[in-house]
Amino acid sequence: MADLEKINKIKVAEHIVECFGGIKNIKNIDKDLTRIKILVDSNSLVKRDDLTKNDNIIGTIKSNELTEVVINFEIIEDVYNKILYMMNEQKQ
């Protein structure tokens, strides 16, 4: 069961990255208890409507230059860390 949960968290992270136009479009990422806050190079690449097609994503909030992804608090830490890992891999 643990492996299935891990795979699900990875899929959520990959879904978020895809909906934000790919890892190259993500400039910065931050989080709080229920939201992953993402700053992108190009907002035109962000597919907000597609984000909520994943059951773990509750909604999105657009504020200034950031888009906040409201996510299941039980998995936010792992999803955030996976996106950070993907960003670091891209830089290498």
Curated annotation (Swiss-Prot):
Listed under GO biological process in this entry are: phosphoenolpyruvate-dependent sugar phosphotransferase system
Molecular function via GO = protein-N(PI)-phosphohistidine-sugar phosphotransferase activity
Give the EC number. Answer: 2.7.1.-
InterPro entries named in the record: Glu_permease_IIB, PTS_IIB_1
This protein's GO cellular component annotations are: cytoplasm
Main subcellular localization, coarse class? cytoplasm
Pinpoint the PTS EIIB type-1 domain residues. 10-92
Localization (cell): Cytoplasm
Record carries keyword Repeat: no
Instruction: Please tell me whether the keyword Nucleotide-binding is annotated for this protein.
Output: no
Q: Sorted alphabetically, which keywords does the UniProt record give?
A: Cytoplasm, Phosphoprotein, Phosphotransferase system, Transferase
Function of the protein: The phosphoenolpyruvate-dependent sugar phosphotransferase system (PTS), a major carbohydrate active -transport system, catalyzes the phosphorylation of incoming sugar substrates concomitant with their translocation across the cell membrane.
UniProt comment concerning the protein's domains: The EIIB domain is phosphorylated by phospho-EIIA on a cysteinyl or histidyl residue, depending on the transported sugar. Then, it transfers the phosphoryl group to the sugar substrate concomitantly with the sugar uptake processed by the EIIC domain.
Protein name per UniProt: Putative phosphotransferase enzyme IIB component BB_0367
Origin species, per record, is Borreliella burgdorferi (strain ATCC 35210 / DSM 4680 / CIP 102532 / B31)
